[in-house]
Amino acid sequence: MNFENNSTIAAIATAYGVGSIAIVRISGPKSLSIAQKLSKKKDIQPRVAHLVTLYDDQSEPIDQAILIYFQAPKSFTGEDVVEFQCHGGVVVANMILQELLKAGARLANPGEFSKRAFFNGKIDLSEAEAIAKMIEAKSEDAAKILAKQIKGELKNYIENLREKLIRILAYVEVNIDYAEEDLPKDLQEQIEQQLNDIQEELQKIVASSKRRAGLIEGFKVAIIGKPNTGKSSLLNALLDYERAIVSDIAGTTRDTIEESVRIGTHLVRFVDTAGIREAHDTIEKIGIERSIQAIEESDIVIAMFDASKPLDAEDKKILELIESYKDQKEFIVVANKVDKGKHLDLSDFDALYMSVKKEITPLTQKLQKLLDSFANTEEIMLVTSRQIEAVTYALENINQARTPLQMGELEIFAFHINRVIESIGSITRPMQSSELLDKMFGEFCLGK
């Protein structure tokens, strides 16, 4: 694969800032000759750590560094790659990078090293996406899931699934060639059962992946309730500082407030919503609409009630919301302000009776237990919306293939199964345009 006339690319691979070591990386046909020029060392052996002095174009020393040469195709990109491990900080790494550019390399685009690895067959697209997500991993569980995907777990699963589908297609196409004969009944039933199994498996993977998406991106927890139930007090207690305004005036929080906290090993974004009540103020009404949106976008919802007062119409609206979303969302019901009295019974909702201004440990413990239940690192997981969309499209075509199979319209059935195969295959090696790939790899950081 040619990349801009076999160009050699260069970038700083480590994060910008102060550190003990920085890594500058080059990849392409000129990598070795450029390394020889900067180090004034001709005998550079592959996969050997060479201690060298690097020089600028005026033969002035820049730094003493470790130079490692990875000869093609045994490198991350599949090309000749050289890494310079120099002293950390911004200045030295930038000086080395500038000399590499003077010597014939060009500055790499974001994600270009991974893009070259993809086009050279060193990684597939699911592995490339996992690399990008690993850099931004928010938890240990995320790192474990992504490490498996980088190792090829999803790729292997997809290949096995494609083989099953291709086998089904082969059975059908043999019968298409003999159009005068119907598909044998036992074979049709066998194919239907195989499709049922594949469909059920894919549906579980999509549902599980959506449910566990917070492991990768961080979980979102919405705090809802009518005004003055203690939502802002809870957020402040979780943060251990006063982020939200606490007031006895209803409607003080008129917009959603988001803050991130670690609960156990999980990164959690708490959303303190506007109180859900009959709104007479346009601004407050917008806040309430955003509260409902926050519920729909959240993984977990904490519903707050004032235990010191009987349920009123506004509380009942919250209970109606819980009933509406209980099959889609996880809820934790909190009866707050028990220090002022206990005048409502929420035992049907397994409520926590507490005063969030005094003690939130029971709530954080229940929340952590719930978050831990998401953390199944053993199951296959789709880690990007692109992967989920590909499987969803495949499921649509499996459904569309059923009637043609039952009606004996085998060519139409084969058309839909081909769509399924293409869609599933696109997870690892898409057939789309280079423009899409440019966009995807462009979201990587420099040096990857």
UniProtKB/Swiss-Prot annotation:
Cofactor: K(+)
Binding positions (K(+)): N228, S247, I249, T252
Keyword Magnesium: yes
TrmE-type G domain sequence ranges: 218-372
Gene3D superfamilies: P-loop containing nucleotide triphosphate hydrolases, Probable tRNA modification gtpase trme, domain 1, tRNA modification GTPase MnmE domain 2
Any one Gene Ontology BP term: tRNA methylation
Subunit comment: Homodimer. Heterotetramer of two MnmE and two MnmG subunits.
Family assignment from sequence similarity: Belongs to the TRAFAC class TrmE-Era-EngA-EngB-Septin-like GTPase superfamily. TrmE GTPase family.
Its job: Exhibits a very high intrinsic GTPase hydrolysis rate. Involved in the addition of a carboxymethylaminomethyl (cmnm) group at the wobble position (U34) of certain tRNAs, forming tRNA-cmnm(5)s(2)U34.
Name the record gives this protein: tRNA modification GTPase MnmE
Species this protein is from: Nitratiruptor sp. (strain SB155-2)
